[in-house]
């Protein structure tokens, strides 16, 4: 007798599970039964469920007859094992029972869809959610919820600040000439940085597709991630911004978490935000540890006047910047020095100016540092306003 493969379908508390069972019955494995007068021999098998399961119907005994396995109760229908730990609920008058499950996301993730994650198994053997129907839920990364917010971190001597995990969205980018700059994680696979950062060590005619392979990128505690592509803003002469797409999603955890993109403007004059980075320190050396600084949003008109005067020799002051000038327009805002006269510096560009919204206890990226040449010499740092590029960011991510 040849081997008979059997497939048993399990119903686990209302959830169908297909389970393959390798069941064999062979004549060689059983000695031939002795013959008696006026009779015939039938071969039979008994299906038994695993521990904590029970047969749904029939006694599990199948007899081989005319090359078919037959059960006296359910015929050729194969048996099903059901979860014995889920007893049938009691019946109620004018009522019925529905089996339901709830999808839940892992720590640091949340449901993306409009539904509540509860699905009911209906008579058509479909899992249905009251809000989204048969559409399965998706889990997306939580953003702007650091485990150790910045206000819980102690300031250290010397004016520099130790982040200690307060800025899990901060990434470090290294060019092919080993020039360090910043980038900001905005979801599991995309980061914002400046167009100037992407062109570090490259000529202005370099194509974006040729820049991507030259970049080294690190998130969390120097965890390397691979760059798939870069996308530059179509008007990068006026909007110093670019997007980086990773080959794989980064797992979100305590050390790696995206910053939230704002739905409103957080750059009113006097508003305080924080900037982190690996830029040069007071000795003009790149720091080995992530530092941060608290800075106030400055008056835009005064900032523009400051930089315009710096190009006129007779108007220059000790605080006038030298060399390249920042991009200043409706897409930017300015930030002043800290109360300790501290500032961002070379290598900090691409980092986010983040603000804490106390209403929803969430951190948002209000700006991306574009002009990091001030280094406490000029009075103002210049940032790309994130609300001004939101449409482009969302479209770029959707199209890629």
Swiss-Prot record:
Pfam families for the chain: Trypsin
Main location: secreted
Domain Peptidase S1 positions: 156-398
Positions of the Sushi domain: 28-83, 84-141
UniProt key word Disulfide bond: yes
BP terms from Gene Ontology: acute-phase response; defense response to bacterium; immune system process
GO molecular-function terms, A-Z: antioxidant activity; hemoglobin binding
Signal peptide: 1-18
Coiled coil: none
Subunit relationships: Tetramer of two alpha and two beta chains; disulfide-linked. The hemoglobin/haptoglobin complex is composed of a haptoglobin dimer bound to two hemoglobin alpha-beta dimers. Interacts with CD163. Interacts with ERGIC3.
The protein's role, per its UniProt record: As a result of hemolysis, hemoglobin is found to accumulate in the kidney and is secreted in the urine. Haptoglobin captures, and combines with free plasma hemoglobin to allow hepatic recycling of heme iron and to prevent kidney damage. Haptoglobin also acts as an antioxidant, has antibacterial activity and plays a role in modulating many aspects of the acute phase response. Hemoglobin/haptoglobin complexes are rapidly cleared by the macrophage CD163 scavenger receptor expressed on the surface of liver Kupfer cells through an endocytic lysosomal degradation pathway.
Name of the molecule in the record: Haptoglobin
Source organism of this protein record: Cervus elaphus
Gene that specifies this protein: HP
